[in-house]
Amino acid sequence: MLRSRVTVFGILNLTEDSFFDESRRLDPAGAVTAAIEMLRVGSDVVDVGPAASHPDARPVSPADEIRRIAPLLDALSDQMHRVSIDSFQPETQRYALKRGVGYLNDIQGFPDPALYPDIAEADCRLVVMHSAQRDGIATRTGHLRPEDALDEIVRFFEARVSALRRSGVAADRLILDPGMGFFLSPAPETSLHVLSNLQKLKSALGLPLLVSVSRKSFLGATVGLPVKDLGPASLAAELHAIGNGADYVRTHAPGDLRSAITFSETLAKFRSRDARDRGLDHA
């Protein structure tokens, strides 16, 4: 049974080079409209990315990241608890903290201890992501083998969570993202192995998990389709993740995911009711 308590992150990219064209919103008015629509159709949180992080992404300065997110934060000032900023730039992260966002999402997993005092003083939640690269954006050179992946991810999170906790960050603010696609390996088998073993990861780590598989490279490699046609495979992977312990899912299609969760819950209720009725019939 899928769970309504799953938190859905809708992906909003304020970029011109994100790998999925339909997620790009560079003009401020279009970004605001897209964010409001995401919240309307099923996003609990809008995850705002001012820079792409795929292997071919162009670098964006912290000043440009801040310039891109500022108008959106102005427009959503009364819903900041539903805004996540997806950036690994400390300057951008500090700006987001000052604006009072609900979440910071760092693909490097918050590696800079100099930022920890600012994080500890805030109350936002932190999406701490694992990547084989350890720093920077995804690359095609990280080759984490399937058989090594779970142990490597657990070791990374044990060390990073310990560092954050020692700096005064409460455990209930931490959300762990094992990374997917190129963040693990160009080989789809590594991501498939991690996705198949989410319950093991969750048991080992004891903290909420966020899974971000939407339109990732390993899905395309598995089903033989381009990014634009990976909506169904993405939804299937997301539902699998939720059914196997994911507490948060980051997606390009929050409305579709929310509808699928709602239908699954309704079906489960009918199944439970029918089972009870059969029990009464045989009493």
Curated annotation (Swiss-Prot):
<feature type="binding site">
    <location>
        <begin position="250"/>
        <end position="252"/>
    </location>
    <ligand>
        <name>(7,8-dihydropterin-6-yl)methyl diphosphate</name>
    </ligand>
</feature>
<feature type="binding site">
    <location>
        <position position="13"/>
    </location>
    <ligand>
        <name>Mg(2+)</name>
    </ligand>
</feature>
<dbReference type="GO" id="GO:0004156">
    <property type="term" value="F:dihydropteroate synthase activity"/>
</dbReference>
<feature type="binding site">
    <location>
        <position position="177"/>
    </location>
    <ligand>
        <name>(7,8-dihydropterin-6-yl)methyl diphosphate</name>
    </ligand>
</feature>
<keyword id="KW-0460">Magnesium</keyword>
<keyword id="KW-0046">Antibiotic resistance</keyword>
<comment type="function">
    <text>Catalyzes the condensation of para-aminobenzoate (pABA) with 6-hydroxymethyl-7,8-dihydropterin diphosphate (DHPt-PP) to form 7,8-dihydropteroate (H2Pte), the immediate precursor of folate derivatives. Implicated in resistance to sulfonamide.</text>
</comment>
<comment type="similarity">
    <text>Belongs to the DHPS family.</text>
</comment>
<keyword id="KW-0814">Transposable element</keyword>
<dbReference type="GO" id="GO:0046677">
    <property type="term" value="P:response to antibiotic"/>
</dbReference>
<keyword id="KW-0479">Metal-binding</keyword>
<feature type="binding site">
    <location>
        <position position="86"/>
    </location>
    <ligand>
        <name>(7,8-dihydropterin-6-yl)methyl diphosphate</name>
    </ligand>
</feature>
<dbReference type="GO" id="GO:0005829">
    <property type="term" value="C:cytosol"/>
</dbReference>
<dbReference type="InterPro" id="IPR000489">
    <property type="entry name" value="Pterin-binding_dom"/>
</dbReference>
<dbReference type="InterPro" id="IPR045031">
    <property type="entry name" value="DHP_synth-like"/>
</dbReference>
<dbReference type="GO" id="GO:0046654">
    <property type="term" value="P:tetrahydrofolate biosynthetic process"/>
</dbReference>
<feature type="binding site">
    <location>
        <position position="216"/>
    </location>
    <ligand>
        <name>(7,8-dihydropterin-6-yl)methyl diphosphate</name>
    </ligand>
</feature>
<dbReference type="GO" id="GO:0046656">
    <property type="term" value="P:folic acid biosynthetic process"/>
</dbReference>
<feature type="domain" description="Pterin-binding">
    <location>
        <begin position="6"/>
        <end position="262"/>
    </location>
</feature>
<dbReference type="InterPro" id="IPR006390">
    <property type="entry name" value="DHP_synth_dom"/>
</dbReference>
<keyword id="KW-0289">Folate biosynthesis</keyword>
<keyword id="KW-0808">Transferase</keyword>
<protein>
    <recommendedName>
        <fullName>Dihydropteroate synthase type-1</fullName>
        <ecNumber>2.5.1.15</ecNumber>
    </recommendedName>
</protein>
<dbReference type="Pfam" id="PF00809">
    <property type="entry name" value="Pterin_bind"/>
</dbReference>
<feature type="binding site">
    <location>
        <position position="105"/>
    </location>
    <ligand>
        <name>(7,8-dihydropterin-6-yl)methyl diphosphate</name>
    </ligand>
</feature>
<dbReference type="GO" id="GO:0046872">
    <property type="term" value="F:metal ion binding"/>
</dbReference>
<dbReference type="InterPro" id="IPR011005">
    <property type="entry name" value="Dihydropteroate_synth-like_sf"/>
</dbReference>
<comment type="pathway">
    <text>Cofactor biosynthesis; tetrahydrofolate biosynthesis; 7,8-dihydrofolate from 2-amino-4-hydroxy-6-hydroxymethyl-7,8-dihydropteridine diphosphate and 4-aminobenzoate: step 1/2.</text>
</comment>
<comment type="subunit">
    <text>Homodimer or homotrimer.</text>
</comment>
